[in-house]
């Protein structure tokens, strides 16, 4: 396990990226917590989020896809 996947900065905050959200290379889409450090993860491509592939609070591995993004 690399870390824990979080869709929002806190439980009370809205998700960084939901289905239908337009994202680009500078858009933060989630946070991965590793060793008590919160790492902002940015989209790797420009497009529209079509699916979140990981549930909030679940462990993730290096290289694991987190979202499906339809290119614009």
Predicted ranges, named:
Residues 1-72:
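Structured functional modules or segments
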């Amino acid at each position: 396990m690399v870390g824990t996947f979080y869709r929002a900065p806190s439980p009370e905050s809205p998700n960084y990226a939901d289905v239908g959200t337009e994202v680009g290379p500078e858009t933060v889409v989630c946070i991965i917590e590793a060793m008590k450090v919160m790492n902002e993860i940015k989209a790797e491509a420009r497009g529209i989020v079509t699916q979140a592939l990981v549930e909030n609070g679940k462990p993730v591995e290096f290289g694991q896809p987190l979202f499906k993004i339809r290119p614009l």
